[in-house]
Amino acid sequence: MEDAEVAVVALGSTAGTARAAVDNMRSAGIKAGSVKVRVYRPFPAKEVFATLGNGRVKAVAVLDRSDALNNHAGPLCMDVTTALYQAGAHVPPSIALPHILNYIYGLGGRDIKPADIEKVFEDLHQVVQGQAASQPPTPPGMPLYENPMYLGVRE
């Protein structure tokens, strides 16, 4: 994470898959990183902000394994967003908070593959380059799209 411009946040074994994707993206020239949340409660908000709210990380994808039906993002994304927003209220304006994208994966017990996470990194890289897709970006530190995007779901 030392020089990462784009990062993914994941729980459990998905973090190992993300690490493999990070290695592939770094060999392709993209400054990628990953954050593994080891303990969910109490949520490590200070550590998340110290890692992602440093001004170097420009875009973050939060990988949730469950959907939140009454929220605009998954539970992990909501906690990461809250950690960045609350701590970000106390930082100088010169430090920009990253854009946040939320991805839901693993519905129906489907596995996530390194290629899926590499696609997420490509999306993040496009956001950093200012080429975000279909929906307009929201302010930094808030989820980038109104609804989460889904990985590995059959249509």
Features from the language model and the residues they span:
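A structural-propensity feature for long, helix-poor, extended segments
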Residues: 48-70
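Redox- and metal-dependent alpha/beta enzyme cores, enriched for Fe-S-associated oxidoreductases
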Residues: 2-30, 43-50
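Secondary-structure transition/capping motifs at alpha-helix termini
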Residues: 24-33, 55, 87-96
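Short beta->alpha junction loops
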Residues: 35-41, 102-107
